[in-house]
From Swiss-Prot:
This is Transcriptional activator protein LasR. The keyword Nucleus does not apply. One of its GO terms (biological process) is positive regulation of DNA-templated transcription. It comes from the Bacteria. The gene is lasR. It comes from Pseudomonas aeruginosa (strain ATCC 15692 / DSM 22644 / CIP 104116 / JCM 14847 / LMG 12228 / 1C / PRS 101 / PAO1).
Length: 239
């Protein structure tokens, strides 16, 4: 599955099952064997009732919930206070309970991987965890570092589209873009940088960034890439 096609399919999916399957397929195409996407609405700490999809082993998921591991798992606490990914290095498991958690997760086949924090535009909080199979930790880390830029994009699209499926939000007024905003976003959608767009549109890079800021505000998102996909889905621009 081509990356852009996958992003579009996430946005256009008709339900949670289809959306989850698309996300798993994209992660698999990148080289990850297991994923878990979890999201909470604003101001909620009810981890056991979070919106969760993925292909983690069912027995492990049940044990995780039964043992209350959301309050032990160091990746969970990390995601509440950071936007940076956290790799499943042995050093992050510091307490006795965390060491037990690590041993049990490893026994379930979740040895090497990373977790990407999710912070939504409407206050949603969550994580995208991805596990990779490898001969050793060094091999796993080399692989994850090589695909990290793509994972940043994937988690943005997954967050934006997943939040729309997981939680009901009031319908907002239609997004209206100026002709210049459409032009700027059109070039952004095919991967052009602000500098490249400024050359194409014969304006300053600061002017491009100004329009990008207005576009993100109108869509209520923090990522220009997500705004571009939303604009495509609304028929405001085309790829």
């Amino acid at each position: 599955m081509a990356l852009v096609d996958g992003f579009l399919e996430l946005e256009r999916s008709s339900g949670k099952l289809e959306w989850s399957a698309i996300l798993q397929k994209m992660a698999s195409d990148l080289g990850f064997s297991k994923i878990l996407f979890g999201l909470l609405p604003k101001d909620s700490q009810d981890y056991e009732n979070a919106f969760i999809v993925g292909n983690y082993p069912a027995a492990w998921r049940e044990h995780y919930d039964r043992a209350g591991y959301a309050r032990v798992d160091p990746t969970v606490s990390h995601c509440t206070q950071s936007v940076l990914p956290i790799f499943w290095e042995p050093s992050i498991y510091q307490t006795r309970k965390q060491h037990e958690f690590f041993e049990e997760a490893s026994a379930a086949g979740l040895v090497y991987g990373l977790t990407m924090p999710l912070h939504g535009a409407r206050g949603e909080l969550g994580a995208l965890s991805l596990s990779v199979e490898a001969e050793n930790r060094a091999e796993a880390n080399r692989f994850m570092e090589s695909v990290l830029p793509t994972l940043w994009m994937l988690k943005d699209y997954a967050l934006q589209s997943g939040a729309g499926l997981a939680f009901e939000h009031p319908v907002s007024k239609p997004v209206v873009l100026t002709s210049r905003e459409k032009e700027v976003l059109q070039w952004c959608a095919i991967g052009k940088t602000s500098w490249e767009i400024s050359v194409i549109c014969n304006c300053s890079e600061a002017n491009v960034n100004f329009h990008m800021g207005n576009i993100r505000r109108k869509f209520g998102v923090t990522s220009r890439r997500v705004a571009a996909i939303m604009a495509v889905n609304l028929g405001l621009i085309t790829l």
